[in-house]
């Protein structure tokens, strides 16, 4: 399991970044508020990671957070029946707007 990734942002999309760690680019889904703060940084960034293998869709998704507490909240939310990773990410975004 991947706990965190540290590297340089090579590309940022609407809701994700591609993080270059040692020559390998990882696509990491993040909340837009974090995207805005990370896109201004040229230095290395560290993202705490939740990884998810979706067998039905055949995808491997990663969700990144700048704080361990946000990742813990994400894990708590996804443990609730009916809340998937995408909805949990939206709820974490709402929580971060109070920071």
Protein language model annotation of sequence segments:
Residues 1-5:
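Short coil-to-beta-strand transition motifs
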Residues 7-9:
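Conserved hydrophobic positions within beta-strands
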Residues 11-98:
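Long, highly charged, low-complexity intrinsically disordered interaction regions
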């Amino acid at each position: 399991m991947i706990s965190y990734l540290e590297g340089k942002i090579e590309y940022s999309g609407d809701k994700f970044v591609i993080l270059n760690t040692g020559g390998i680019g990882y696509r990491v889904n993040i909340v837009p508020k974090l995207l805005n703060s990370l896109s201004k940084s040229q230095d290395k960034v560290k993202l705490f990671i939740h990884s998810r293998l979706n067998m039905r869709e055949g995808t491997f998704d990663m969700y990144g957070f700048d704080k361990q507490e946000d990742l813990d909240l994400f894990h708590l939310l996804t443990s609730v029946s009916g809340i998937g990773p995408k909805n949990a990410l939206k709820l974490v975004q709402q929580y971060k707007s109070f920071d």
